[in-house]
């Protein structure tokens, strides 16, 4: 059994990266591997946008990640710098920066690149999507 971290750099919609990452994560867990963390970076931070509203006939990828994190206790880390550049903030950042409101999906955590560096050093595999 290996421990994994996924690095997601693609947005929730518009490319296949994030949906492929979620399917890979589900397959890892089904095979008995341990998925410790998913780190969302660059455009991947858009997977944590609470205001995303897909069409009724589309899979809700943001809530799919949230469910994966909740059910399997996977840390959903979002790069704080990349998130703020793309208009995603939690309540603490929104207050600190005098933003209108927060829109980080529950279950996701704003974190720094140090969290990703720690994952690279700690887990058996880091896979980028």
Curated annotation (Swiss-Prot):
Q: Which GO terms describe its biological process?
A: tRNA wobble position uridine thiolation
Gene source species: Pectobacterium atrosepticum (strain SCRI 1043 / ATCC BAA-672) (Erwinia carotovora subsp. atroseptica)
- The highest taxon in the source lineage is Bacteria
Named from the GO MF annotations, one term is: sulfur carrier activity
**How is the subunit organization of this protein annotated in UniProt?**
Heterohexamer, formed by a dimer of trimers. The hexameric TusBCD complex contains 2 copies each of TusB, TusC and TusD. The TusBCD complex interacts with TusE.
* Subcellular location, principal: cytoplasm
UniProt keywords (A-Z) are: Cytoplasm, Transferase, tRNA processing
Signal among the record's keywords?
A: no
Family the entry assigns: Belongs to the DsrE/TusD family.
Its function?
Answer: Part of a sulfur-relay system required for 2-thiolation of 5-methylaminomethyl-2-thiouridine (mnm(5)s(2)U) at tRNA wobble positions. Accepts sulfur from TusA and transfers it in turn to TusE.
Enzyme Commission identifier(s):
2.8.1.-
This chain belongs to the protein called: Sulfurtransferase TusD
Q: Where in the cell is it found?
A: Cytoplasm
Query: Which residues act catalytically here?
Result: 79 (cysteine persulfide intermediate)
Annotated Gene Ontology cellular components are: sulfurtransferase complex
Catalytic EC class: transferase
């Amino acid at each position: 059994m290996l421990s994994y971290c996924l690095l997601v750099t693609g947005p929730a919609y518009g490319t296949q990266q994030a949906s492929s990452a979620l399917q890979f994560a589900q397959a890892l867990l089904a095979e008995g591997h341990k998925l410790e963390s998913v780190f969302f970076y660059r455009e991947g931070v858009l997977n944590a946008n609470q205001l995303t509203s897909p069409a009724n006939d589309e899979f809700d990828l943001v809530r799919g990640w949230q469910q994966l994190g909740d059910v399997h206790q996977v840390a959903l880390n979002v790069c704080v710098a990349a998130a703020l550049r793309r208009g995603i903030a939690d309540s603490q950042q929104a207050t600190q920066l005098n933003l209108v409101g927060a829109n980080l999906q529950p279950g996701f955590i704003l974190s720094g690149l140090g969290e990703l560096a720690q994952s690279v050093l700690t887990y058996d595999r880091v896979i980028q999507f």
